[in-house]
Amino acid sequence: GVDVKLIGPLPTPGIAYMTRYFSCDFGVVISASHNLYEDNGIKFFDGNGGKLSDELEHEIEREIGNGTVTRSSRELGRAVRVDKQRTEYQRFCAATLAAGASLEGLKIVLDCANGAAYKVGPRLFADLGAELIPVGCSPNGRNINDSCGSTAPQLLQLTVPGVRADLGI
């Protein structure tokens, strides 16, 4: 058993960052990435937020596939919900921009693909001063990349000129 910090939903790079931020031994993400929800998979990060070796990933997959990983209730770790992850990850993202950078005066269409960025993405861009038109920000667990995101770039192609935005992301 291991102790777990539950921090989602957060985009995959956010989990990599928070793994390092919290000095965790490793991070785990359940993600459909740029696919539809049926293609959800598991991604693992090492304590530095980097990708695990292929060998270690295969070993974990074998253990999960065998169904042999069992523990008594006394051996289980604890799970704790952490609530500051979005604020911290948003702060980190903003800090990667040049000091004093602002998006003020820009009209931006932001397509979050009904995925894990649906909260942190709009807040980040709005806090940086953008006039924001968010789309794909209503996830229900089954609509990731459904008529939005990477599977439907036409949503941005139509929305950006339709609202006279400066750009679409």
Indicate residue ranges for each PLM-predicted region.
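Gly/Ser/Thr-enriched, mixed-charge loops and adjacent short helices
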Residues: N40-V163
